[in-house]
Amino acid sequence: MRGMPLNSMKLFRITDVMRRKVRHIHFVGIGGIGMSGIAEVLLNLGYTVSGSDLRTSDTTEHLSSLGATVFQGHKASNLTDVDVVVTSTAVRKDNPEVLEAHRRSVPVIPRAEMLAELLKMKVSIAVSGSHGKTTTTSMIATVMASGGLDPTMVIGGKLGSIGSNARMGHGEFIVAEADESDGSFLKLSPSLAVITNIDREHLDFYRGIEDIKDAFLQFANIVPFYGSAVLCLDDPHIKTILSDIKRKTITYGMEPAADYRAQELRFNGAVTEYELYYRTECLGSVTLSVPGMFNVYNSLATVAVARELDMTFPDIQQGLKSYVGVGRRLEVKGKIAGVTVVDDYGHHPTEISATLAAARQVWKNRMIVVFQPHRYTRTQALFREFLGAFTEADLLIVTDIYPASEDPIEGVTAEALCDGIRSLTRREVRYIPNFSDITDYLMTVVQPGDTVITQGAGSVNSVGVSLLSRLKEVEDSRAA
């Protein structure tokens, strides 16, 4: 960071107290994308790691291969001689492992508290925001790695270049995603804090937008006096808190007043180009290998961070060009019989609109979207916003709400959402609750040139896997 004697800070600063007191760390819900990344870094640091999840997955198998003990299912007996138990927001308070930990007086801490300990290791960059955290974190990590900084990274998605959502680097930096969903990101104390945007999200925890804005304001002010907050000046809610931030601020966006700006934007399929300005100085051209206006914003945040770390602009250019995306963010899963299958994690109306606009930039023919709403509380709170989020879809299929440990709310259903969307569009909207029935239906309607997007944070991506498998069977039978 500019002005900081980084060469003198090349020490692992994870506290000596933690190393003396804690050897065995247990994760309840270890297969979750946020939990597994922390677990992987701790394994690389030499800690004994165990954990449990309701089902095994590629993620749990990967952790097992690194030395973790992973249990399928949650049982009190899964807790052996553990020193601390880490939980995610999806874990209920009556979870048997949590109850057993309390019975034994073993500390039970949220994921963010353990992440905070990891951030003490090195000079830390934490990326927050209602949308775009994972992509921006992975883009920053890619650029830093490309420039030879060899960062430690903890990301909320699988980065294709490393095949994982975490990596233990040998450099002096750590870059991590900061999840604001339950307010626990305020336990972090990064040297650089990024806020991509502020929106009405996680309304099961926050009382409203003012409450959300206050949390992000606290996050910006949590950085040390020598640190900085990197913020998107185009975001209207960020503008309202800017004057209350007491730390150095670096802004980006299209606004003329932003420190870093993108001008002369050019979109060509999956490739985006623009001229980058720092205040009045044109630094040069930027080429992105990923589509969408949201990725322009993500890249501007990345540039701001990289320049604070004294990276050269040619290194930044090369790193941005080499970035090809992160798992479950407009991820192409395959193309068979002329049908392209894409998966995207976006589950908030703002994210969905941006994702489908970016998809339209790349795929010009018929777009079929299979959407699985995520959480009853979100569907209820943002019902009206969801109604207008699918304007780019030529055919929309909505399946049942993914509960994510929530109990149903009376009247909040996928059928009601379908009815609302139908009232605003002439395009076809179908409610199909069963995944296998969705695949069967798709097999009757897909044509060469179609793009099928599975949209949502739950399990809807399995529909894409099934569709590709069925298409492959048909293709093979025709070739026989």
From Swiss-Prot:
Reaction equations catalysed: UDP-N-acetyl-alpha-D-muramate + L-alanine + ATP = UDP-N-acetyl-alpha-D-muramoyl-L-alanine + ADP + phosphate + H(+)
Biological pathway: Cell wall biogenesis; peptidoglycan biosynthesis
InterPro entries linked to this entry: Mur-like_cat_sf, Mur_ligase_C, Mur_ligase_C_dom_sf, Mur_ligase_cen, Mur_ligase_N, MurCDEF_pg_biosynth, UDP-N-AcMur_Ala_ligase_MurC
Protein location: Cytoplasm
Name of the top EC class for this enzyme: ligase
Gene Ontology terms, MF aspect: ATP binding; UDP-N-acetylmuramate-L-alanine ligase activity
Name by which UniProt lists this protein: UDP-N-acetylmuramate--L-alanine ligase
Gene name as annotated: murC
Organism domain of life: Bacteria
SUPFAM superfamilies (alphabetical): MurCD N-terminal domain, MurD-like peptide ligases, catalytic domain, MurD-like peptide ligases, peptide-binding domain
Single biological process term from Gene Ontology: peptidoglycan biosynthetic process
Record's GO cellular component terms: cytoplasm
Record: residues binding ATP: G129, S130, H131, G132, K133, T134, T135
Pfam family, one: Mur_ligase
Lineage of the species this protein comes from: Bacteria, Pseudomonadati, Thermodesulfobacteriota, Syntrophia, Syntrophales
Physiological role: Cell wall formation.
Main localization of the protein described in the UniProt heading: cytoplasm
Family: Belongs to the MurCDEF family.
Residues that span the membrane, as ranges: none
EC number(s) reported in the record: 6.3.2.8
Organism: Syntrophus aciditrophicus (strain SB)
Sorted UniProt keywords: ATP-binding, Cell cycle, Cell division, Cell shape, Cell wall biogenesis/degradation, Cytoplasm, Ligase, Nucleotide-binding, Peptidoglycan synthesis
